């Protein structure tokens, strides 16, 4: 669920997902349209696409199971749908970590009017 996603971002990227990515670019936060503005925004685009492929559970509300092994997040549990959600969240958190140096404050609270281009397909 979204609180677990926040926790994973804190653990993996070392920063608050809500603060840094809650309203960033064209895809971080609620909704998403247009073109990703930078690598961090692309992390959110890919995460949105990942959630869009999940069937049979609710990525924003359902709890999943994960553990930490040697500093890595390992998604677990018996429910394959919830495990998919975990993998989406884990991959996004890793993406945020790997692209921290591209984060640009000019995309924080980026106006939606700047996100009118046609979206690329997932």
Swiss-Prot record:
Q: How is the cofactor bound?
A: Binds 1 Ca(2+) ion.
Task: Give the main EC class.
Answer: hydrolase
Q: Which UniProt keywords apply?
A: Calcium, Disulfide bond, Hydrolase, Lipid degradation, Lipid metabolism, Metal-binding, Secreted
Q: Which molecular-function annotations from GO does this UniProt entry contain? A: calcium ion binding; calcium-dependent phospholipase A2 activity; phospholipid binding
Which InterPro entries does the UniProt entry name for this protein? PLipase_A2, PLipase_A2_Asp_AS, PLipase_A2_dom, PLipase_A2_dom_sf, PLipase_A2_His_AS
Q: Which cofactor does it need?
A: Ca(2+)
Reaction catalysis annotation: a 1,2-diacyl-sn-glycero-3-phosphocholine + H2O = a 1-acyl-sn-glycero-3-phosphocholine + a fatty acid + H(+)
Gene Ontology CC entries for this record: extracellular region
| E.C. number(s) listed in UniProt | 3.1.1.4
Expression sites (tissue/organ) = Expressed by the venom gland.
What is annotated as the active site? 47, 89
- Chain positions recorded as Ca(2+) binding sites: 27, 29, 31, 48
Q: What is its main location?
A: secreted
GO BP annotations listed: arachidonate secretion; lipid catabolic process; negative regulation of T cell proliferation; phospholipid metabolic process
CDD domains according to UniProt: PLA2c
Cystines in this chain: 26-115, 28-44, 43-95, 49-122, 50-88, 57-81, 75-86
Q: Where in the cell is it found?
A: Secreted
Q: Which Pfam families match?
A: Phospholip_A2_1 (PF00068)
List the PANTHER family hit by this protein, alphabetically: PHOSPHOLIPASE A2 FAMILY MEMBER, PHOSPHOLIPASE A2, MEMBRANE ASSOCIATED
Family, according to the entry, reads as follows: Belongs to the phospholipase A2 family. Group II subfamily. D49 sub-subfamily.
Q: What does this protein do?
A: Snake venom phospholipase A2 (PLA2) that has high lipolytic activity. PLA2 catalyzes the calcium-dependent hydrolysis of the 2-acyl groups in 3-sn-phosphoglycerides.
Q: What is this protein called?
A: Acidic phospholipase A2 3
Which species is this UniProt entry from?
Craspedocephalus gramineus (Bamboo pit viper)
């Amino acid at each position: 669920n979204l609180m677990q996603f926040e926790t994973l971002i804190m653990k993996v990227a070392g920063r608050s997902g809500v603060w840094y990515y809650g309203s960033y670019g064209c895809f971080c936060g609620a909704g998403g349209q247009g073109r990703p503005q930078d690598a961090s925004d692309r992390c959110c685009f890919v995460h949105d696409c990942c959630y869009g492929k999940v069937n049979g559970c609710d990525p924003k509300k359902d709890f999943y199971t994960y553990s930490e092994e040697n500093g890595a997040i390992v998604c677990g549990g018996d429910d394959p749908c919830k495990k998919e959600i975990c993998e989406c969240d884990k991959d996004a958190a890793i993406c945020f970590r790997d692209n921290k140096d591209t984060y640009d404050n000019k995309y924080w609270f980026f106006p939606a009017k700047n996100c009118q281009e046609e979206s690329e397909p997932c």
